[in-house]
Amino acid sequence: MIQKVQIRTNPLITFSAVLHIGACAAVFWQVWLWPWALGVVIADHLLLVGCGLLPRSRTLGANLSRLPDAAAARGEIALTIDDGPDPLVTPQVLDLLDHFAAKASFFCVGTAAQGHPDLCREIMRRGHSIENHTQHHRYNFSLSGPRSLHREIAWAQSTLTNITGHKPHFFRAPAGLRNLFLDTVLIRLNLRLVSWTRRGYDTINRDPEKVLKLLLHNLRAGDILVLHDGNAALTRNGVPVILEILPLLLASVRGAGLHCVTLRAAMEAVVDVPAAPVPEPDFPLPHLIPAARGATL
């Protein structure tokens, strides 16, 4: 059965609230203390913003940046693929994964999924998982308040569930950036935040060798890797970086005695529960072709 997410109290946020109350009380007690109180409040806000700019930080709440020890002991790593599905790139990624008998977790954007529902279902059919990467993938996501965060994530949750018939269990913020409100929103939606152990910056880095080096440097069991099938940077030959490096990456993983699994498989306590799908129009899967769209940041 699915483990329910327990309500958590973040010590930093509690401290921040106490700090604000203390600053107000100090000014009320002695008005001349206002410059000091203002400075303390500003410093606190800068700290909170800074924590949100660190994708792997746990300061603002629970954050999975590595697989559990049990998964690492089994020689598992998690390959996560963001920003899709892309009708030109994703089918080729799926074929490469099949060739190496590797599984991946696709963090899909709701609008992209709506445009290619059959491709989402194909991802699931081949034994991979689809997780939540927001509805629109806006880069100002981390500037949103609680209501906006909830609406954007819940919208994607509904979109992806209706298309695939399975609820996402994990969430990743655009570019990994977040704020102090996100943890509470994810608790309410019963989602778990996932960042990564290492990434290759393959949306902006056009050099496959550099991307591969970043992903393989000190690679070990339990790592979570990030690549992109959507918004993929193109090599000088016009090939999406993920397609250039994925065979080499998967071969290296196999050579190291490791194997790629979905996040759901690695997290043994999380079990997939089918949900009633909402009928969607059928679109034929695109043919596999080498060309791909240009990269965007």
Roles of regions detected by a PLM:
Residues M1-S65:
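N-terminal membrane-anchoring alpha-helices
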Residues G50-L53, S57-A72, N237-L297:
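C-terminal domain-boundary segment and adjacent tail
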Residues G52-F141, W155, T159, H259:
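Active-site beta->alpha N-cap acidic-glycine motif
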Residues I81-D83, C108-G110, N132-T134, A173-A175, ...:
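A cross-domain feature marking catalytic cores of carbohydrate-active enzymes
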Residues G84-L88, C108-P117, R138-R147, R172-L180, ...:
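Acidic-and-aromatic substrate-binding clefts and catalytic sites of carbohydrate-active enzymes
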Residues L94-C108, H128-S129, G145-N179, T184-R192, ...:
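CE4/NodB-like, metal-dependent polysaccharide N-deacetylase domain
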Residues H136-Y139, R199-G200, N231-L234:
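A short, flexible beta-alpha/helix-coil linker loop
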Residues L177, L182-N218, L258-A269, H287:
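His/Asp/Glu-enriched short active-site or ligand-binding loop at hydrolase and phosphoryl-transfer sites
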